[in-house]
Structures are given as structure tokens and as C-alpha cells.
């Protein structure tokens, strides 16, 4: 017997699905929208209680959408199925926030770079280095993670960075990495890596346009700071 509380067990005027159909999705709270996705609660919590406590316990939607499947399944009432639903919703949200109609994403300012990578990188618990490869019109043609771990100039080798750009016929590159602390202030190592890659790029004819450091909903551009 299924003892889990379902949306249909709620009074009809309290069911988020009914409210969405009648009034539109925009009137629903975050908890109600999440309840529509998850559908069932537990034997001790109806789905609205579960959705509300889930958002509160993880610290809000941003934090909820950056949990791993292991972290989610440790939360009372969240099994593998619900964790997978949340992860899929999280990924769709990230992709939508960085989506532009058509297949082209042109970089004109550091903010364009931030808008492209922020959702993916701002809450990472480890440092990750991404390379954006651009064509002669500054349109992003390829993005790849090239390193995960603590960045320093002895580990981040220019060969690994520029090899991808050469293979993809890139005209220029932008590198991005995150600071798990949430503070995007460049470290001495960040500056050293930037200068080293800038120098190597000039030698092979693939310019390093910028190095963007991602923090918690903020970023620093090495180009804007005058480092390169």
C-alpha cells in the first residue's frame, strides 16, 4: 500500500496543479512549483510540506540546484527518484539561463562570459577551469572543462589549454575558473597563470582575450583589471 501523501490528497483549492491551471504558473510559489514536479510526499509529510522543507533545508533554490545526488538522498523524504528529478530540473534551469536563440553566442564583454558560465560554476565545491574557444567574430564555438582541482601555475600547462584551441581552429580563447570560497578576488597564482597563458598565446597566434574568475553571483575580469 502506498502511504505517501500525493497532490490529490490535498484539498482541491490547495493543489498546486489546480492553481497553475486556473491562474498560471507565475502565481505559484517556489515550493508549489517544486511540488508539481515531485508529485508525492512521504507518509509523514504531504508534498507541499516536503517541498517547502527541502528548499528551506538546503538554503534556497540556488543551493538546492547545486546539490549532488549523494547529498540529496541524505535528506529525509528524498530518494533516488526524487533526487534525479531535482537534478534534471536543475540542469534544465542552467541550460535555459545560458541559452540564446540560434546556435551562436557572441562575446562582447566580460559580462557575456559570466552570463554563460555563472550558473554552472558559482557553487562548485572544487576549482574548475573552463576554456571557451572563439572564432574570428568572437562567437563561442566550443567549451570544455580542462582541469578540476586547486589551480597553480605548475599544474595548469599551456599545452593542455592551447591544444584544444588548435584542434578546434580557434582564433582566440577565454579561460574561466571558480573560487569555491565565493570571493572572486584573483590570487597571485591566478595572475601568474594568466600572464603565462597570455605570453604563450601570443607565440602561437591564439590570443587569450580574458581570464574570468567566478565567485558567488559575482566575477572578476583580468582584462577589466588591466592584468592583460
UniProtKB/Swiss-Prot annotation:
Family assignment from sequence similarity: Belongs to the UPF0758 family.
Residue ranges annotated as motif JAMM motif: 177-190
UniProt cross-references to Pfam families, sorted A to Z: RadC (PF04002), UPF0758_N (PF20582)
TM region positions: none
Gene3D superfamilies, per database record: 5' to 3' exonuclease, C-terminal subdomain (1.10.150.20), Cytidine Deaminase, domain 2 (3.40.140.10)
One of the protein's GO biological processes: proteolysis
Positions in coiled-coil regions: none
Keyword field: Hydrolase, Metal-binding, Metalloprotease, Protease, Zinc
Amino acids binding Zn(2+): 177, 179, 190
Stated name of the protein: UPF0758 protein CLK_2387
Residues annotated as domain MPN: 106-228
Organism, as annotated: Clostridium botulinum (strain Loch Maree / Type A3)
GO molecular function, one term: metal ion binding
Domain of life: Bacteria
Amino acid at each position: 500500500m502506498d502511504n505517501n501523501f500525493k497532490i490529490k490528497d490535498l484539498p482541491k483549492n490547495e493543489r498546486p496543479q489546480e492553481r497553475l491551471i486556473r491562474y498560471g504558473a507565475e502565481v505559484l510559489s517556489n515550493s508549489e512549483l517544486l511540488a508539481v514536479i515531485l508529485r508525492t510526499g512521504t507518509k509523514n509529510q504531504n508534498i507541499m510540506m516536503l517541498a517547502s522543507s527541502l528548499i528551506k533545508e538546503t538554503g534556497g533554490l540556488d543551493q538546492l540546484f547545486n546539490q549532488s545526488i549523494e547529498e540529496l538522498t541524505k535528506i529525509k523524504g528524498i530518494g533516488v527518484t526524487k533526487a534525479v528529478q531535482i537534478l534534471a530540473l536543475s540542469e534544465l534551469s542552467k541550460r535555459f539561463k545560458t541559452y540564446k536563440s540560434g546556435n551562436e553566442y557572441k562575446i562582447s564583454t566580460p559580462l557575456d562570459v559570466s552570463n554563460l558560465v555563472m550558473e554552472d560554476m558559482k557553487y562548485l565545491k572544487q576549482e574548475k577551469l573552463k576554456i571557451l574557444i572563439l572564432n574570428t567574430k568572437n562567437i563561442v564555438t566550443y567549451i570544455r572543462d580542462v582541469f578540476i582541482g586547486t589551480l597553480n601555475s605548475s599544474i595548469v600547462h599551456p599545452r593542455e589549454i592551447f591544444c584544444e584551441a588548435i584542434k578546434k581552429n580557434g582564433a582566440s580563447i577565454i579561460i574561466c575558473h571558480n573560487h569555491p570560497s565565493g570571493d572572486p578576488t584573483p590570487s597571485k597564482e591566478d595572475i601568474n597563470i594568466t600572464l603565462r597563458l597570455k605570453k604563450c598565446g601570443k607565440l602561437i597566434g591564439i590570443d587569450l582575450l580574458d581570464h574570468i574568475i567566478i565567485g558567488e553571483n559575482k566575477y572578476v575580469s583580468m582584462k577589466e583589471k588591466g592584468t592583460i
